[in-house]
Amino acid sequence: MTNADPHELQKFSDLAHKWWDPNAEFKPLHDLNPIRLNWIDAHAHLPGKRVVDIGCGGGILSESMASLGAQVKGIDLATEALGVADLHSLESGVSVDYEAIAAEALAAREPGAYDVVTCMEMLEHVPSPANIVAACATLVKPGGWVFFSTLNRNLKSYLLAVIGAEYIAQMLPKGTHDYARFIRPSELAHFVRAAGLQLVEIKGITYHPLAKRFALSNDTDVNYLVACRRSV
């Protein structure tokens, strides 16, 4: 059975035409993108690397990594979003190979094929995040990097990421997140180690409402990033 929630796929497919509008529903992803891109590149040195972006959606991060000189494959099961990603790639002239395939299926087909694996803002939308982490570990080459970003599960994250972002500030559509699927850093660290990866860094992302911008921080209470490596 596919490790995907049909409701989640439909939710993102319905918004597919808005992926590349920096002032619409995906504005937070556009605002987050430079921060996560620079953080990934600082660790993995993207130019010339073979990268797979799992849960790539409309291709915001995929295209950015390709623009830095990486050879990027983007995968997702939301086919409408992939269609938008393909079209934008043609318009921008930035080459990305997109495919509608599950992470587990790609891992079975191409084990150890990638220097870098990214899985950003995706784990909190699937029934079994541990299986996605395991697929990422299978896809990456020995010595390669795996990057995750997700949301912590606590009262603060519920108030800020759900009530604040979806209902008060309306930065995100209502129902974007299911709080029960948020993942504590300790839980993700367990998934990472169980998959045979070495945890290198956990970094928080903080939103500054007055400046209306995101920044890296040591506060992992809400949004956080995880960098891992597969041992040689």
Curated annotation (Swiss-Prot):
GO terms for molecular function: 2-polyprenyl-6-hydroxyphenol methylase activity; 3-demethylubiquinol 3-O-methyltransferase activity; polyprenyldihydroxybenzoate methyltransferase activity. Keywords: Methyltransferase, S-adenosyl-L-methionine, Transferase, Ubiquinone biosynthesis. S-adenosyl-L-methionine binds at residues 36, 55, 76, 120. One of its GO terms (biological process) is methylation. InterPro entries: SAM-dependent_MTases_sf, UbiG_MeTrfase. It comes from the Bacteria. Its EC number is 2.1.1.222, 2.1.1.64. Pathway: Cofactor biosynthesis; ubiquinone biosynthesis. SUPFAM superfamilies: S-adenosyl-L-methionine-dependent methyltransferases. Belongs to the methyltransferase superfamily. UbiG/COQ3 family. This is Ubiquinone biosynthesis O-methyltransferase. The gene is ubiG.
